[in-house]
A protein has these predicted regions:
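Hydrophobic alpha-helical transmembrane segments
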Residues: 115-116, 121-155, 162, 270-366, ...
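Basic, amphipathic juxtamembrane/active-site segments
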Residues: 202, 208, 219, 374-396, ...
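Membrane-embedded transport module
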Residues: 297, 328, 337, 582, ...
């Protein structure tokens, strides 16, 4: 870094420090002052901002967008496409060619004359730089645009009060300082906010502080703290609501939040994944080969030919030919094309590099709801303790579901819908929302597994209404409502209740219990401690019908090597019944209580043969996923609830749906627009196709370059002249690379996508060693035929190159040598293109190419066009300018059998490789 850049960096760092200090002061003011003062300072009220206030706040404080990765400017993207080690080599070659082919002849230096002036080489090299750079720029721009469009399809929203207490749902990016936001379980905190009102609000700040335990947030004014994260009345962007609900006012947005300052401080290029590291490792292996080969070729050519300048030019050309300059572009194009294809299958990719992991999944862990079932919950029965339909049970359930302000799940919606359907037939259900007012609420959490609302009617009677999982409800009930009124909840009554519930579970119903307590008298605010001595009044039986497509989807996943495991919080009986209905064979089932008594080693053994895990907590789901990964599996977890977020983060790839809670979407790598296993199966197939085409190019490039090394080394040592001019090698390399650009659109054999594919960089090395040298055999054969047969026969009248000096002299000798070399170079030029290009069709499939497996039309068209262009060049004026001599017809009588033999040998080696290693790609 120079002095000017250093000064700029120091100034920018100082500016960021000043900005962060200002934000800290704003947060400190909000935390340590009464709510009234905070609202006044932010120029807002509890009624929310009006449009003018929103505009003013946005103009003053900016948008709520966080800089996760710095987007490159057009200039930087152009520089990235044109300025890299590969184009640097080309520029170096262009400079040297300018000096030797233009400057020296112009100045008549080192024996050159003005007649030797030639700008063709320089023009071709610069044209190649332009074409390759432009191609890479266009493809990378398209990839970036495709990724942005896909991400734009995923919307994360928040609920705010605006314009006279009207609640509206807005995109999180549109949030401004002073907005009044409403938070509930499952929400991501949309900005740095000051809590105004909260009910049992617990927030996870693990992403900011590393603290795993949720922290309770309250609206109470705080004393000054050493660290802003210690304030219990401030919730920060990047954290999420674990349980409870709250109203808050936005203090800081976007990059000015604590999370934003951390994200922008480390923003830059995307972090390398294991896949990108593997691709880079292959690139560096090839570059190291090149770095070893180029000096060898340079010294051998210089010593044997005596022309060190030509040797230097040839060495640089070899460097270009052996370097996989198109690899980054091909990989990027494959990923972008895969992402677009997956979007057509209702699958949105948040991170392009996760596509490879998606195709590698061999175990899919998923919740039952919405996956095995239709995610259309219907309240079938509202039963009293005797098992009879009872309107009073439905009425209490409605009061609980309607007035709760946390995450509204499908069962709450089913209760409200059922009440609205039956209110016309039963006057006791009319106008419940108007006849009662909410007093308080104890939100749901996954430890208690129940939710409580406190309501009051117009006569002043207060009721605490609680609903939740049956066992957890029984633990807080001491009475039950029977025929003769309220009775103690004896063991006999408890057994009768559990039997009724078991019968419903066996039929596939999900059952919740409902209880109430009249005129409760809490000490202070209502809390969990008040959930006691309640009266059980009945239960609610819900049906979530199984999906008709589930059985086919699970079979399709199994046919593609993916084992489905169910990880659910529901009880075992309901889960077993649903699995039976959809045709999912349950070999073994483990409950959350079983996991608590198992060591990691015991669970690792049991998990392999267990198809269903039931009654799991969120942490237990994450533990199962982690254990399966430690067993060597690539694990995907599909979920949409707050209880799934931990497991999604623990998985190799998290999968969610567009309707999921914020924290689930934030944790996901892949988002489905439709929660269906069949959609997921199609996405996995697209992931495998994408990986297949990437690994094809990587192995093609590696093996082809490795074979070329042997050919060039032998030619440098044995021939009295260069086997190809530097410009020939560069031009050949460009046309070959252009013919490979269609590989992302190639067909993939059904057998390849039938099972998971893990990225394995080590397989590239073995493939390179097995397949690469094959082409060298036929290169050597071409050397022999061109040097000893075709050139003497059609150029020098039967005289070999080394004997020309004995038969010719002066200008005649120079002309004859140029003709001899021109035909030799044309012969190897054409043979190289044929062998190098046709091997694409050999390597792309373990089957017989053109017969059992055909490449896509774009691949076939580009490769054949490349062959045709380079075959014709020696017969054109352009070829003459390059120094080529037209090839005789007899050459093609040799070339065609030679290439056919090459294809036969390559196919045989390919079969042997598959027998030895089990697979080709």
């Amino acid at each position: 870094m120079n002095k000017k850049e250093n000064r700029i960096a120091v100034r920018q760092a100082a500016e960021k420090t000043v900005i962060r200090d200002e934000q800290n002061r704003r947060i400190e003011f909000a935390a340590t002052n009464p709510i009234k003062e905070v609202l006044k300072n932010l120029h807002t009220t509890l009624r929310g901002l009006d449009p003018g206030g929103v505009f003013t706040s946005h103009a003053k404080y900016g948008s709520n967008k966080v800089t996760h990765e710095k987007k490159k400017s057009l200039a930087k993207r152009l520089a990235g496409a044109f300025i890299n080690p590969f184009t640097a080599i080309l520029f170096c070659l262009a400079v040297v060619s300018t000096i030797t082919d233009m400057v020296f002849p112009y100045l008549s230096l080192f024996g050159s004359t003005p007649e030797d002036f030639d700008c063709l080489t320089v023009v071709i090299i610069l044209t190649m730089v332009f074409i390759s750079g432009t191609l890479r720029f266009v493809q990378e721009s398209r990839s970036g645009n495709a990724a942005e469009k896909l991400l734009a399809m995923i919307t994360t929203t928040c609920t705010v009060t605006r314009k006279d207490q009207v609640k509206v749902e807005i995109p999180m990016d549109d949030l401004v300082v002073g907005d009044i936001v409403h938070l509930s379980a499952g929400d991501m905190i949309p900005a740095d906010v000051r809590i105004l009102d909260a009910k049992d609000l617990f927030v996870s700040q693990a992403s900011l502080t590393g603290e795993s335990e949720p922290i309770e947030k309250t609206p109470n004014v705080s004393a000054v703290k050493d660290s802003i994260t210690d304030y219990t009345n401030i919730a920060f962007m990047g954290s999420n609501v674990v349980s409870g609900s709250a109203t808050a006012v936005v203090v800081c947005v976007g990059d000015n939040t604590l999370f934003g300052s951390m994200a922008s401080a480390v923003a830059g290029e995307a972090v390398e994944t294991s896949f990108t590291k593997g691709v880079n490792a292959v690139s560096w292996v090839l570059i190291r080969f090149m770095l070893v080969m180029v000096p060898l070729v340079f010294f051998i050519s210089g010593i044997t030919k005596g022309d060190w300048l030509d040797a230097f030019l040839f060495g640089i050309s070899i460097a270009v030919g052996l370097t996989p300059e198109m690899l980054p572009m091909i990989v990027t194009t494959c990923l972008a094309k895969g992402a677009v294809s997956m979007s057509k299958e209702q699958t949105i990719v948040k991170n392009l590099n996760s596509i490879q992991n998606f195709g590698a999944i061999d175990i899919l862990c998923t919740d039952k709801t919405g996956t095995l079932t239709q995610d259309k919950v219907v309240l079938e029965y509202h039963l009293n303790i005797k098992g009879e339909d009872d309107t009073r049970v439905l009425r209490h359930a409605y009061l609980n579901s309607y007035f709760q302000t946390g995450y509204t799940n499908l069962m709450d919606l089913a209760i409200i819908q059922k009440t609205e359907e039956e209110e016309a037939a039963d006057s006791r259900l009319l106008d419940l929302s108007e006849n009662y007012v909410k007093v308080d609420e104890i939100p749901f959490d996954f430890t208690r597994r129940r939710l409580t609302t406190v309501v009051q009617d117009k006569q002043g009677k207060t009721q605490m209404v609680t609903k939740g999982a049956v066992e957890e409800m029984l633990s807080v009930c001491t009475f039950a409502e029977c025929d003769d009124g309220v009775e103690p909840l004896t063991d006999e009554v408890r057994s009768r209740i559990l039997k009724t519930v078991d019968d419903l579970n066996d039929k596939g119903f999900r059952v919740l219990a409902i209880a109430q307590k009249s005129n409760p008298s809490p000490v202070g605010a209502f809390g969990v401690k008040d959930e006691c001595d309640m009266v059980l009044i009945g239960y609610l039986a819900f049906l979530d019908p199984p999906k008709e497509s589930t059985a086919d989807a699970i079979k399709a996943l199994k046919d593609h090597g993916v084992t489905t495991k169910i990880l659910t919080g529901d009880n075992d009986k309901v889960t077993r019944t649903i699995c039976k209905q959809v045709g999912l064979k349950v070999r073994n089932m483990l409950l959350g209580s079983d996991l608590d008594n198992m060591s990691d080693a015991e669970l690792a053994r049991a998990a392999e043969s267990t198809d269903v895990f039931a009654k799991l907590t969120p942490d237990q789901k994450a533990r199962v996923v982690s254990i399966l990964r430690e067993n060597g599996h690539t694990v995907g977890f599909m979920g949409d609830g707050i209880n799934d977020a931990a497991a999604m983060k623990a998985a190799d790839i998290g999968i969610s749906v567009d309707t999921a809670v914020d924290v689930a979407k934030e944790s996901a790598d892949i988002i489905l627009l439709e929660k269906d296993l069949m959609v997921l199966e199609q996405g996995i197939i697209e992931g495998r196709k994408t990986y297949a085409n990437m690994i094809k190019y990587i192995k093609m490039t590696a093996s082809s370059n490795f074979g070329n090394m042997f050919s060039v080394l032998a030619a440098s040592a044995l021939l009295p002249f260069l086997p190809m001019m530097s410009v020939h090698l560069i031009f050949l390399n460009l046309i070959y690379d252009l013919s490979c650009t269609a590989i992302p659109w190639d067909n993939v054999d059904e057998e390849f996508i039938a099972k998971p594919r893990k990225w394995d960089a080590s397989s590239v090395g073995s493939f390179m060693i097995w397949i690469g040298p094959t082409s060298s055999i036929f290169d050597f054969t071409t050397y022999i035929f061109m040097y000893f047969v075709f050139c003497p026969m059609f150029v020098s009248g039967g005289v070999l190159f080394n004997d020309l000096a004995a038969h010719y002299s002066g200008a005649g000798l120079a002309a004859m040598q140029a003709q001899y070399i021109g035909m030799f170079q044309a012969g190897w030029f054409v043979e190289s293109m044929w062998s190098q290009t046709l091997v694409i069709h050999m390597i792309r499939t373990p089957k017989l190419p053109f017969i059992q497996s055909r490449a896509s039309a774009p691949v076939t068209l580009l490769t054949m066009t490349g062959i045709a262009i380079l075959t014709v060049i020696p017969f054109t004026v352009f070829g003459t300018a390059l120094g080529f001599v037209a090839l005789p017809a007899m050459y093609f009588a040799y070339l065609i059998p030679c290439i056919l033999l090459y294809m036969v040998l390559a196919t045989s080696l390919k079969k042997a490789y598959v027998r030895h290693y089990g697979e080709l790609l």
